[in-house]
């Protein structure tokens, strides 16, 4: 192989990685010399009304999402759901972790590589940091419920699209309605966009409580946005702000009797460990 051809192959590989491809799907290369099949020109699609920036448009989804009477039925409904293309590229469904009757629900973005391989949310480096963050205010996976907005890993760990979020959002709403938590913690911009919407980003919203309407619940839930642990790994200076958010979560839970003070150990600054 010449230097020029090797450089061309590396450039093509880098482009595929940028697009989100992270594995080869064909065992044999296609015959590019063969005549291409004739394709019928597609009819132009009708233009859709633009949505407001930062707003996720809800799409029609499987009725089993709203009809699930238990978490087991909800998981089965997700396993049977084929409208989200991410299911075809992911290794498996990453459903949830933690207590099924938790009073605090942690909502992340989407599974990464480790989560896709193991089948549990937040098990990679970001998950290890999340465990440390929860432990700093006396919580752990046995006292919270952990779930992602999108339960399948996007190729290349890219950010889920608004369409993918909208396809999975009814299942997230049903998950919340079945667990019936008292408080939500929204980790990162995707969770905020899915449940709060609007134009404001996570930097502006973090640390302030918002009310979120959930289908299937007769009351709004208070939700606290904060930084995603993966972001904190890339930007360690933001850990101080996340620590302030955790202290606010602890204060709210104790003062609102969501959790008794005895259920939450003394706070220990996770940024110093």
How would you name each of these model-derived features?
Residues 7-10, 15, 22-261, 269-273:
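A polyanion-binding, active-site-adjacent surface
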């Amino acid at each position: 192989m010449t230097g020029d051809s090797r450089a061309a192959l590396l450039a093509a590989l880098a482009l595929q990685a940028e697009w989100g491809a992270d594995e080869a799907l064909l065992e044999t290369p296609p015959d590019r010399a063969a005549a291409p099949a004739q394709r019928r020109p597609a009819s132009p699609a009708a233009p859709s009304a633009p949505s407001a920036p930062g707003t996720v448009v809800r799409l029609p989804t499987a009725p089993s999402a709203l009809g699930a009477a238990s978490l087991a039925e909800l998981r089965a409904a997700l396993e049977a759901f084929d409208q989200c293309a991410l299911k075809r590229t992911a290794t498996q469904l990453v459903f949830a972790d933690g207590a099924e009757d938790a009073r605090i629900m942690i909502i992340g973005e989407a599974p990464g590589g480790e989560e896709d391989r193991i089948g549990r949310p937040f098990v990679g480096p970001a998950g290890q940091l999340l465990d440390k963050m929860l432990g700093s205010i006396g919580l752990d996976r046995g006292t919270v419920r952990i779930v992602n907005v999108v339960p399948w890993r996007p190729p290349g760990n890219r950010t889920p699209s608004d369409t993918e979020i909208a396809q999975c959002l009814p299942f997230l709403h049903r998950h919340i309605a079945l667990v019936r938590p008292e408080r939500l913690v929204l980790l990162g911009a995707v969770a905020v966009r899915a449940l709060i919407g609007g134009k404001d980003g996570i930097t502006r919203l973090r640390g302030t409580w918002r009310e979120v309407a959930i289908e299937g619940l007769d009351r709004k839930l208070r939700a606290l946005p904060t930084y995603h642990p993966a972001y904190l790994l890339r930007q360690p200076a933001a850990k101080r702000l996340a620590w302030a958010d955790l202290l606010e979560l602890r204060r709210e839970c104790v003062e609102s009797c969501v959790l008794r003070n005895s259920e939450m150990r003394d706070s220990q600054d996770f940024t110093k460990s």
